[in-house]
Design a protein with these regions (language model features):
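Extracellular lectin-like interaction modules
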Residues: 1-577
């Protein structure tokens, strides 16, 4: 077998039928020395006889002309080691492929330069037999002939895959699969999927549990169908094997977006947005953690994870990531399975119900001073009781709806850690803790350095363990802000304590009971380190403190130590003799 070169010096070449050879290399070149290059058109299949070995090479170079292949390249048992298709033409169909490409068991390369249009029902590029690489140049966009009709599948073994141009940026594909149906460990690099319009109509599946790394270098990944990205949990980058290089938006229409097995690493100065629809179905799931870049100098944000009525599932978020925003519609929810740590006063904002899925989970936004933590929705344990710690530094933590009403917490601590005397932010609870049953075990809100207000706007605060409210004696305060009657109660001989600072109650009755139902459990101490005052300008409030046979300790009621408050009405105290 010998090399064969065909050079037309700018003339077109058309072969009507199959091309069969047993050559070491077949090179067809229609590049012109000047002017327009010729077209290379082959209507049939291109195959190499296996008897010639498994290291044959095909090179088609059309210069500024086009390449039009009407059949398959390679066969079921291919003898082609490498395939090169090259065109500098900028038309969307500069390289038209109507058949599959398959290489042999000898490691080689598939290199395509120029915009690609898929003319077959589906295009399958199969290099799964060896460490053959597949490379689409930066000019090599990939589009369907008819929107949503042609799909693309690429399979390699250990070979890397690089898609330098946008996929479906002009005409969307039917579906897209890159090493998702194999166990190949090759790295995968992708530019954009889609543009302002969808790039794929059906499912997009990138990588598998053995994939070395997935490098997402584009700014948009937009599909109608689901998106799945999977890489090794160990592999090339010590587990951070899904890499996002630029500010980027992932979008589907009512379908899931999942990052599986591997952690995700965001480059410095990146903003990540993932959305499956503002008010419709579609889950967002990160099986691994999300990390920023160690030593980064610019802000990295998770600008928005929006799942509509779906579920957002997250593991840990850490390493130089600042603001985090998560949004669900009323029927959606967020599940947190790992610690959330922000940098440089970064805030955490979750809209929609939130469930804690780790045995013990910490949310920490204290770095840089403090960033607010806001959960606009209910807050519960997932399936079984969990431990939750939230610390927001100098900023406020706010939970707007009920805590532990569906599945209770074992322990709950909000801004309870003194830290370096910087965890001073207030706490606002807009709903209840518990309901007909206790919502938490031991619970602490605030600490002895808290200078922000601790505000309770619910009607029930029910724990099965101790309930402590703490603040700094100089700047802190406690406020019960509800026009309806409020009940604070504990079971299990558990104390209720309001530390130093006065408590101001609203224009309704406040009941604190450490033996609800008078079960004979002897109650537990109720302690106030400050005064109990009524809110001014309204109806005077009633007060009932029932410790059963334990102690009720209070500095003053209706008097701040200097002046009468005149906003407290009936008072009933029950305690030890």
């Amino acid at each position: 077998a010998n090399d064969t070169d065909v050079n037309t010096s700018g003339g077109s070449i058309t072969i009507n039928g199959d091309v069969v050879g047993s050559l070491v290399e077949l090179d067809i070149d229609t590049t012109a020395n000047s002017g327009t290059s010729g077209t290379i058109k082959i209507t049939g299949d291109i195959t190499a006889k296996t008897g010639g070995g498994a290291d044959e090479i095909l090179v088609l170079n059309a210069g500024s002309g086009k390449i039009d292949l009407g059949g398959a390249v390679g066969a079921t048992t291919s003898a082609l080691k490498s395939v090169t298709l090259s065109s500098t033409n900028t038309a969307a169909d500069a390289v038209k492929l109507a058949g599959n490409i398959k290489t042999s068991a000898t490691a080689g390369a598939i290199d395509i330069t120029g915009p690609v249009t898929i003319a077959a029902t589906d295009l399958v590029i199969d290099a799964d037999q060896a460490a053959t690489t597949v490379t689409f140049a930066s000019t090599s966009t990939v589009n369907a002939t008819s929107a949503g009709t042609q799909g693309l599948t690429i399979n390699t073994g250990a070979g890397n895959i690089s898609m330098g141009g946008a996929i479906g940026g002009t005409t969307k594909l039917k579906d897209l699969s890159i090493n998702s149906a194999t166990t190949g460990a090759g790295d995968i690099t992708l530019a954009n999927i889609g543009s302002s319009t969808d790039g794929v109509h059906g499912a997009t599946s990138i990588g598998n549990a053995n994939t070395g790394t997935i490098n997402l270098n584009g700014s948009v990944y937009k599909t109608v169908g689901s998106q799945t990205y999977q890489a090794s949990a160990t592999g090339d980058d010590t587990g951070n094997n899904i890499n996002i290089a630029n500010t980027v938006t992932f979008t589907t229409t009512d379908t899931n977006i999942k990052f599986e097995t591997s952690d995700v690493e965001l480059a410095d100065n990146v903003s990540l947005t993932v959305t499956t629809g503002g008010s419709t179905a579609g889950d967002i799931e990160f099986e691994g953690s999300i990390h920023g870049t160690t030593g980064g100098t610019d802000a990295t944000h998770i600008a928005g994870l929006t799942s509509g009525t779906g579920t957002v599932t997250l593991n840990a978020i850490d390493t130089d990531i600042e603001d985090i925003t998560i949004t669900n519609a009323s029927a959606g929810s967020t599940i947190l399975k790992g610690n959330i740590t922000t940098a440089n006063n970064g805030v955490l904002s979750i809209t929609g119900d939130t469930k804690i899925g780790a045995d013990t989970l910490a949310i920490d936004t204290t770095a840089g001073g403090g960033g607010s933590v806001t959960i606009t929705g209910k807050l519960d344990s997932l399936t079984t009781s969990r431990n939750l710690d939230i610390n927001s530094g100098t900023a406020v933590t706010e939970i707007t709806e009920d805590i532990g009403d569906v599945v209770a917490f074992t322990t709950l601590d909000i801004n309870a850690v003194v830290g370096d005397n910087t965890n001073t932010g207030g706490v606002t609870l807009g709903g209840n803790i518990g309901g007909t049953a206790a919502g938490s075990g031991n619970t602490q809100i605030g600490n002895t350095k808290t200078t922000g207000a601790i505000t309770l706007s619910g009607t029930t605060y029910f724990t099965s363990g101790t309930l402590d409210f703490k603040s700094n004696g100089v700047g802190g305060s406690y406020v019960i802000n509800n026009a309806s009657d409020v009940t604070i109660k504990t079971t299990g001989v558990s104390t209720v304590t309001f530390g130093t600072n006065d408590l101001t109650i609203g224009n309704a009755k406040l009941t604190i009971d450490t033996d609800p139902g008078d079960t004979g459990a002897n109650g537990a101490d109720i302690t106030f380190g400050g005064n109990i005052l009524g809110a001014s300008g309204g109806v005077a409030a009633d007060l009932e403190l029932d410790a059963d046979t334990a102690d009720v300790i209070v500095l003053g009621i209706g008097h701040d130590g200097s002046n009468d408050n005149n906003e407290i009405n009936d008072v009933l105290l029950t305690g030890s003799d």
